[in-house]
């Protein structure tokens, strides 16, 4: 058999849990990063999560994280589009992407169909970003600077997303490009 990773749900307030803040990333400074150290942390049986840690938690997390990032950025673009009087079609397309993101968020994050649909969502998102590029000149400097800084978040796991998409297509028996 295959080795199994066990995962536990541990509160950051548990005795023996220490979080050391790390230097922030060059984008989205509102999201903190840190290193966790566990020293003699006591676990109860109910703290151990069921199933295989890698298969059931770590692997699906990347997909769930992608969906949260897309939702957050789409929400931001929607707000900017309304505040700055962008064309209504931009707001409508962005609202559609938000609805699609929500729909995918309730699907199985391990399913090839979810990854293929996520690939389509990402393509639509890229088209929206291209279409809105000139509109950023109509927003205030602070908002535009924040967007330029934070849009790098979309590139963080693009290679991993591309590999998951390729794997999903191969599970359907096609390497369709």
Give each language-model segment a name.
Residues 20-104:
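Glycine-rich beta->alpha junctions and the first turn(s) of the following alpha-helix
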């Amino acid at each position: 058999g295959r080795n199994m990773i066990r995962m536990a749900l541990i509160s950051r307030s548990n005795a023996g849990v220490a979080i050391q803040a790390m230097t922030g990333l060059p984008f989205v400074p509102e999201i903190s990063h840190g290193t966790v150290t566990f020293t003699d942390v006591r676990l109860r049986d109910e703290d151990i999560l069921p199933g295989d840690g890698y298969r059931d938690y770590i692997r699906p997390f990347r997909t769930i994280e992608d969906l949260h990032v897309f939702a957050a950025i789409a929400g931001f673009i929607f707000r900017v589009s309304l505040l700055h009087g962008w064309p209504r079609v931009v707001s409508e397309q962005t609202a559609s992407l938000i609805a699609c993101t929500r729909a995918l968020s309730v699907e199985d994050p391990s399913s090839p169909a979810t990854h293929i649909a996520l690939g389509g969502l990402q393509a639509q998102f890229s088209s929206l970003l291209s279409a809105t590029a000139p509109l950023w000149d109509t927003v205030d400097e602070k908002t535009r600077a924040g967007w330029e800084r934070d849009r790098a978040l979309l590139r963080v796991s693009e290679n991993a997303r591309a590999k998951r998409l390729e794997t999903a297509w191969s599970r359907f028996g096609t390497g369709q490009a």
